[in-house]
Amino acid sequence: MVVTQALVQAGADTVVIDREHGAIGRENLHAMIASTAGTNCRPVVRVGKRDEAMVKLALDMGAAGIVFPQVNTAQEASDCVAMTRYSPRGRRGFGPFIGILDGVCPFKSIYRSSVARSSATS
């Protein structure tokens, strides 16, 4: 967490939080992502495996992106993308948490417009 804060203060525009090779638990992940709130630094989480619950957790905490390990086929890549997108183009669920609210956003209208855009492009 201290390293993340130092990177934010140094002006980093992105920080990669490595849960595949790093011993980072849920609480520390949340603290690391939260330390970027209100800054121009975007937290990207490298998940330990292609696990939908792990991906949703990171995104709900406010991760700006996900890096998936060991993606070797087009089908695996498609499955990874589906984990990050809301229905109807994906499997991500909606919950009004900090990552979705992003502090002050009107989450219902953002969600509805996201679904409308997804539906229009399907």
Segments predicted by a language model, with ranges:
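Conserved anion-binding
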Residues: 53, 65-122
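Glycine-rich, proline-tolerant flexible connector loops at the mouths of alpha/beta enzymes
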Residues: 3-4, 8-31
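Hydrophobic faces of well-ordered beta-strands that scaffold small-molecule active sites
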Residues: 15-17, 43-47, 66-68, 120-122
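Short beta-strand/turn micro-motifs at beta-sheet edges
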Residues: 2-4, 108-109
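Alpha-helix-loop-beta-strand connector modules within alpha/beta enzyme cores
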Residues: 24-60, 82-89, 113-116
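Glycine-enriched alpha-helix->loop->beta-strand junction motifs that scaffold or abut catalytic
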Residues: 10-14, 60-65, 85-86
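Short, ordered loop/turn segments at secondary-structure junctions
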Residues: 19-22, 48-49, 71-73
